[in-house]
Amino acid sequence: MARRTKIIATIGPASEDEGTLRGMIEAGMDVARIGLAHGSLDEQVQKFQMVRKVSSDLGKHVGIVVDLPGPKVRCAPFDEGGIDLTEGSQISLGVEGSESSSDFINVDYPNLLQDVQLGDSLSFGDGQVVVIVEEREGDRLKARVVHGGRLDGRPGLHVPSDRLRLSSPTDHDLTLLDTFVELGTDMVAVSFVRSAHDIRRLGVEPAPRGPMIIAKIETKAAVANLEGIIEASGAVMVARGDLGSEADIEELPHLQKHIIQECIALGRPAITATQMLES
């Protein structure tokens, strides 16, 4: 019997050599995801071309989805090795520089102090670390860690989407989109979609003349506008990491099931993503 459920795998630092990629394809990878939030454009183009080459060498068609960064707020990089934050400890946040440390986290969002309110819960990564904002001190926010963990690299910072003054897709997204449409990408995933208008702003030919557009459902606004988003898209992704930062954890399985059922009713493929190997 043919396998109807397809496997999407992200091509990252551990899998971007030809040998590993070949093994992933032989093991059953149907679609390679290339996340555009990290690395240079040249590096991502090289990954794209490598997937095409290896799949061609194996005589197998492997789809490629490029995942646009979207208006994601990210921390400035930590020192090599990262930091460990323990429950009950205090951390400061601001927008002052290009590096983060064990007691001060810089963020690449200029409106952080205006958009975040006292009492807000902010999560780093996909919920690895959660803090509560307790006070303002000059041009800094002071927050207490309520769920400790490790941070390294440039983790995302989840700010409540109803106050985030950023739209999707961003100008940078549209520039990246042009590059990968020209290269012939099969699919494009759009981050932090809030309405069908965000999908229409891409301005690309719909599949099959252009790439399939995948709307990532990761905000409360997207859930509220779900039917219109599904109708405007070629497929939908349940992005459980950021969606789980906006919804209570016990609500997430019900939201996931609801989104998938709506996709089935409207005849669109549904993708479940984030921490699949840990769940």
Named regions from a protein language model:
Residues M1-S279:
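Non-catalytic helical/linker scaffolds that mediate oligomerization, partner binding
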